[in-house]
Amino acid sequence: MLSLHKTLEMPSADTALPGRAAPIPTAQTHFVNGHALKGPYPEGLETAIVAMGCFWGVERVFWKVPGVYVTAAGYAAGITPNPTYEEVCTGRTGHTEVVLVVFDPKVVTYEALLKTFWENHDPTQGMRQGNDIGTQYRSGLYVTSDAQAAAAAESKAAYQQALSARGLGTITTEIAPAGPFYFAEDYHQQYLAKNPNGYCGIGGTGVVCPIGLGVEG
């Protein structure tokens, strides 16, 4: 998941790649559970979009969470419409690698997913995650409602307290409204289920997120 053409600066609308009008081809069903990757999803389910570095490992973390109906690797928070992986890796689309998480809030809450998010990557690294460097590896939460926005901001503040108490850095995670989500190519979907020994760059700070624990810091 390393790009030969890395950039740490976000493109402008003028410098971003043009992309294309039609979506790129991808899988129709989830390789692990057989659910429809693109929906329609059962009534009552909600969606979350998270960015934690290379989406291969991130997706595996979330498809294992009880209450998660389906996951998908994709691109979001950028400019270029319907980008390819190669285009995203140039840094000229503005997108970050993300995972779409479709979940049943009666089984797993958004707050619980946030705890999983914070504890499974290092949100202080800016335009990188571990050895993966570039704007497409930045940390992000792309929210679909005011309630998600409030919960994301509250969790960020709580986790920052926990990190600061351990002498760790400042969170660089961006929290923004979810714009278009573009499904990644077929071979990226559920990659580590298809390739169990494949690359996984995911790793946390070792600091527990205090959400739902009844503790501060």
From Swiss-Prot:
Function (record text): Has an important function as a repair enzyme for proteins that have been inactivated by oxidation. Catalyzes the reversible oxidation-reduction of methionine sulfoxide in proteins to methionine.
Q: Has the keyword Oxidoreductase been applied to this entry?
A: yes
UniProt keyword Cell division, yes or no: no
UniProt keyword list: Oxidoreductase
Family, as annotated: Belongs to the MsrA Met sulfoxide reductase family.
Name its species.
Caulobacter vibrioides (strain ATCC 19089 / CIP 103742 / CB 15) (Caulobacter crescentus)
The protein's matches in InterPro entries, at most eight in alphabetical order, are given as:
Met_Sox_Rdtase_MsrA_dom, Met_Sox_Rdtase_MsrA_sf, MsrA_MetSO_reductase
Which residues carry out catalysis?
C54
Could you give a GO molecular-function term held by this entry? L-methionine-(S)-S-oxide reductase activity
Q: Which NCBIfam families match?
A: msrA (TIGR00401)
A cellular component term from Gene Ontology for this protein is:
cytoplasm
Q: What class of enzyme is it?
A: oxidoreductase
Q: Which SUPFAM superfamilies match?
A: Peptide methionine sulfoxide reductase (SSF55068)
What does the record list as GO biological process? cellular response to oxidative stress; protein modification process
| Annotated protein name in UniProt | Peptide methionine sulfoxide reductase MsrA 1
EC code(s) of this entry? 1.8.4.11
What domain of life?
Bacteria
| Pfam families (alphabetical) | PMSR (PF01625)
> What catalytic reaction does the record list?
L-methionyl-[protein] + [thioredoxin]-disulfide + H2O = L-methionyl-(S)-S-oxide-[protein] + [thioredoxin]-dithiol; [thioredoxin]-disulfide + L-methionine + H2O = L-methionine (S)-S-oxide + [thioredoxin]-dithiol
